[in-house]
Every structure is written in C-alpha cells, then in structure tokens.
Curated annotation (Swiss-Prot), chains A, B:
This is Phosphoribosyl-AMP cyclohydrolase. One of its GO terms (cellular component) is cytoplasm. PANTHER family: HISTIDINE BIOSYNTHESIS BIFUNCTIONAL PROTEIN, HISTIDINE BIOSYNTHESIS BIFUNCTIONAL PROTEIN HIS7. It is found in: Cytoplasm. It catalyses: 1-(5-phospho-beta-D-ribosyl)-5'-AMP + H2O = 1-(5-phospho-beta-D-ribosyl)-5-[(5-phospho-beta-D-ribosylamino)methylideneamino]imidazole-4-carboxamide.
Length: 152, 152
C-alpha cells in the first residue's frame, strides 16, 4: 500500500471544494461505502472501508472493504468469485462517504444470500407494525454450496 | 411517534428472511441511510437515522434523519425547502442500512452546497496523490441566500 490520505482540513470550504482527497474516517477509522452497479445504477450494498481498504481499492481497481464482524480487510468476492471491478469512485461534500460504481464478476451477485443486491426487501407498516417484504427471491448462487466449497 | 422497532433477532435466518423489520441500530443508536432519486436512481446523499427519525420517516412519508453534527433530529429540507417525499423504503440483509427512494421538492437539490447530489466529485490519483475532481458545478440554489433567509 503506497497511497496515503492526508488529514482532513478543518476549513469547510477546503473540504468541499479543494483538490485533495482527505476522507474523514470516523473514530473507528472507517468511512461508509455505497456500492451501485455501473450498468444500471442499482444499489447493491453498503459497507465500510478503512484507509488500507480504500487505498487498495483505488490502487487495484478491485473493491476492498473492512469487515466489522470479522475485524479484518475484506476483498469482496474472494470466496464467492463475485469480485467488484471499480468503474468510478466518488465522495460526498464532507468526505465521510464513498460511492463505488462497480461491475460485478462471477454470478453477478453481491449479497451473501446469493441475490443480486443486499436490498432485497421493502419496508412497510402492517397493523401498526413495521414489516419487511421480500421482493427478490432469485438466487444467483447457492450460498451453502459456494461458501462450503471455498472453506474446503 | 407510535411506531417502535423490536430488538433484532440473534437468529441470522430470521433477520434475513423473517417478516419483522428490526433495524440493527449501532452503539450510538443509528443506522445508515442511503438516499437515491426515485426518478432516475441517482445517489443523492448518505445520512444516519435514529429510531425516532426512522419512525417519523415511515409514518409521515417525509425523510427525517439524525444530525450527528448537531446531535438532533433533522427534517431534511426544513430550511431550504428541499424536502424528500419517500416513494419506497428498503433494508439490507442484516438490517443495518436503509435505502430511501425519494422525490425531492423545492429546488430539486439535496446537497447543502446547492447541488443536486452530495456526490459531486470523482476520486482519482494524480502524481501518486489521491485527488478529487468536481464534476457538477451547477447550483440549484445559492446556499448563502437560502440559509440566511431562514435564519432571519
């Protein structure tokens, strides 16, 4: 990893309009990453990146994240083959969020459940209770098979 | 606020496929909210919601967030008029992120800089340094005027 990120400016104008990319990592050293499909803009997933994951993503063109559950660097798709080739990287006004437009390899599935997107459910209210409804049941791969194979 | 959210199940299958909406608020009581334009899917902003903001959003159909900088409930667009009418709410596999598809009122601008989207810059590398490039200079409103008016 050779790419490093300078500390964010305290000057709001510099942060919003200056030429330097100075991501505002939170107290855990993470920024939020929003991932959409470069093909049609569909939201695929939301994840987090530390400086190492962000630098690797920029340098290799393949999306890397930081897994908060495993506390480790996470090359997305390493097990399932559904790696993400980054077509464009954007950041927001206060530089604490990253937007990746990606092309998904493998089964064209981003969710570990085998679905194309992690956002396969709508939220609504039913009899005064908040409920979710699955709108995408199509599995691009069988998680039990794919993740078992890679473990072996 | 009448809508409440039960604690998330510890059973992964229940969380991923059960009918209950049980958002996984983090240790600060927040979930990440990704906001896209219902018209064309453009990513407009990333923000955070506490239970109150999420319940108000579901109940009123107008997007509410929790401002981490002001530590308070934030009805988006209250000052600028650029409120967000929610067309659809989605959640992801582990229910720690929310996706709002919205129609923006007012100037059709979501960013406080007056731009349509907060993601008005691409990220790249120039001479070994990470740089940002502004790709959208169009301001839908003049922030100095709009926010000054509302303060007065």
């Amino acid at each position: 990893m050779t790419l490093t990120f300078p500390a964010p400016s305290k000057d709001k104008a510099e942060l919003e309009t200056g030429p330097a990319f100075t991501p505002r990592f939170d107290e855990k050293g993470l920024v939020t990453a929003v991932v959409t499909d470069a093909r049609d803009g569909e939201l695929l997933m939301v994840a987090h990146m530390n400086a190492e994951a962000l630098a690797l993503t920029i340098e290799t063109g393949i999306a890397h994240y930081y897994s908060r559950s495993r506390n480790s660097l996470w090359k997305k798709g390493e097990s399932s083959g559904n790696t993400q080739a980054v077509q464009e990287i954007r950041t927001d006004c206060d530089q604490d969020a990253i937007w990746l437009k990606v092309t998904v390899a493998g089964h064209d599935a981003t969710c570990h459940t085998g679905r194309r997107s992690c956002f396969y459910r709508t939220v609504g209210v039913e009899n005064g209770k908040a409920r979710v409804t699955i709108t995408d049941e199509h599995r691009h791969f069988d998680p039990a098979q794919i993740y078992a194979e890679k473990k072996g």
